[in-house]
Amino acid sequence: MGDQKFQRKKYSTPRHPWEKDRIDAERQLLIKYGLKNKRELWRAQTILTNFRTQARTLQAKLRYNDPLAIKQFQLLIGKLSRLNLLGENATLDDVLSLNIEDILERRLETLVYKKNLALTMKQARQFITHGHIKVNDRVVTIPSFMVEKSMEDSITYNETSPFTDENHPLRMEMSGTKEEENE
């Protein structure tokens, strides 16, 4: 009953396919965040666009003190604060000032790398897809999983993963690189 008849695209492509500046900026983001292809970047851009569109619509409705718009504003800010994109007392201008990097920073792939569970972004992606990472006691195999603020501290290795052993060669290598960075 709730099944979709057709799957829809979850992203929109750029209006002009061959803009050099946009292509270069996208390439830098792909490298920085270890994305597999531009489709993942466009999906994050679409998520950001949807948040911004909703904020602009609410901004227009709030001028007329619409009670439903006030409730929708609270829900939007609540969602963005759960994702740790904004604070609890954020405004619509804060929503409009979000950028693509804010969205990409909340991906599981990025947070695994930032928590030093992997040496590189590509390795973080591989750990996730191979089932070595768990969030809230559940194995997550989706690198683009958006991690909420409450889940962030529970990102660890899976118990069945060989990386839980502190004496694993890769873990020893990671602790060695941490010590070198601290010096």
UniProtKB/Swiss-Prot annotation:
Keywords: Ribonucleoprotein, Ribosomal protein, RNA-binding, rRNA-binding. Belongs to the universal ribosomal protein uS4 family. This is Small ribosomal subunit protein uS4. It comes from Picrophilus torridus (strain ATCC 700027 / DSM 9790 / JCM 10055 / NBRC 100828 / KAW 2/3). GO terms for cellular component: small ribosomal subunit. Part of the 30S ribosomal subunit. Contacts protein S5. The interaction surface between S4 and S5 is involved in control of translational fidelity. The lineage of its organism: Archaea, Methanobacteriati, Thermoplasmatota, Thermoplasmata, Thermoplasmatales. InterPro entries: Ribosomal_uS4, Ribosomal_uS4_arc, Ribosomal_uS4_CS, Ribosomal_uS4_euk/arc, Ribosomal_uS4_N, S4_RNA-bd, S4_RNA-bd_sf. One of the primary rRNA binding proteins, it binds directly to 16S rRNA where it nucleates assembly of the body of the 30S subunit. With S5 and S12 plays an important role in translational accuracy.
